[in-house]
Regions:
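Short, charged beta-turn/beta-strand-edge "cap" motif at the junction between a beta-strand
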Residues: 16, 219-224, 242-247
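Short, structured beta-strand/loop micro-motifs enriched in basic residues and often containing a Trp
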Residues: 197, 211-223
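Glycine-enriched loop-and-adjacent helix/strand subsegments that border the catalytic/binding cleft
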Residues: 3-205, 228-229, 252-265
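Surface-exposed flexible segments
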Residues: 225-234
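Loop/turn positions that initiate beta-strands
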Residues: 210-212, 233-236
Length: 265
């Protein structure tokens, strides 16, 4: 699917314990949320037609390219949802219509001194990864197909497969379905440029109000290997969404399973 004209956004802090494990709680110390388990905010990782570094299309498929300098980079295993954006007459977002979902690697550099989340998210071609297929969303609320899906991830290093993120049901997201949608709409309209966050309404304006958004809705907590090991060149990354009624958390292929596979270069 061609996403070069789609604004791409991510959600920070939508799974319990992820920010603590990633060492990023300090970045959000001055961000006040309405309730304790609310995500911290949203951030851009691709802005179509932008002249900034975020204007480079960074989403890859089978290759994850690390920067040419020494970095500490981690897989961030996520679900990405493709939404249609509905605006009112004054270009405020009034609805998000969920169409399809897939797996996503929101690979992140643990970068000291970064002022914005986006500075850790995009550094060149193949900074990100997206799954090998899309699953149509029948309804973005409880009772739909996404109720049955789990998200898991692995890194294969030197022939040994290690769980990287915990195996988590999508219903384990802190904010999901209507609660997430309403929160996203609010943040797209009202989030200010403050601390590590950015003014998303301004980005929508600068991108000429795109009709769709790819939103990566948050990374799972890390398994032990993922928490304590950064990526190395030659690693093989798997981010898998599977229907727990039919599939297992493995590399076998099925019509209901989405597998993102990347080799780290």
């Amino acid at each position: 699917m061609q996403l070069k004209y789609v604004i791409c956004l991510g959600v920070a802090g939508n799974f319990a314990h992820h920010l603590e494990q990633a060492g990023e709680l300090e970045d959000f110390k001055n961000i006040v949320t309405d309730v304790e388990d609310a995500p911290k905010g949203i951030f851009p990782f691709y802005l179509p037609a932008s002249d900034s570094f975020l204007g480079l299309y960074s989403i890859g498929t089978d290759t994850l390219t690390l920067p040419p300098y020494e970095v500490n980079a981690q897989v961030e295993p996520e679900i990405a949802v493709l939404f249609d954006i509905v605006y009112n007459d004054v270009n405020e977002v009034v609805d998000l219509k969920a169409n399809q979902f897939t797996t996503f690697n929101d690979c992140t550099i643990r970068k000291e001194g970064a002022k914005k989340i986006s500075e850790k998210k995009s550094w060149g071609l193949n900074s990100k990864g997206i799954g090998n297929k899309w699953i149509s969303i029948d309804t973005f609320e409880e009772g739909g197909i996404m109720d049955n899906y789990h998200l898991c991830s692995f890194v294969k290093r030197d022939g040994v497969v290690h769980p990287y993120g915990v195996d988590a049901p999508l219903l384990g997201y802190s904010y999901f379905y209507t609660k997430l949608k309403n929160w996203l709409i609010d943040k797209m309209n009202t989030q200010e440029d403050f601390g590590p966050l950015e003014n998303i309404a301004m980005h929508l304006n600068d991108c000429n109000y795109p009709s769709q958004a790819l939103i990566s809705i948050g990374a799972t907590a890390y398994a032990e290997f993922g928490e304590h090991n950064y990526l190395q060149r030659g690693d093989e990354v798997y981010v898998i969404a599977y229907d727990s009624r039919y599939d297992d958390a493995d590399f076998s292929v099925s019509s209901t399973k989405v597998i993102l596979y990347q080799v780290v270069r």
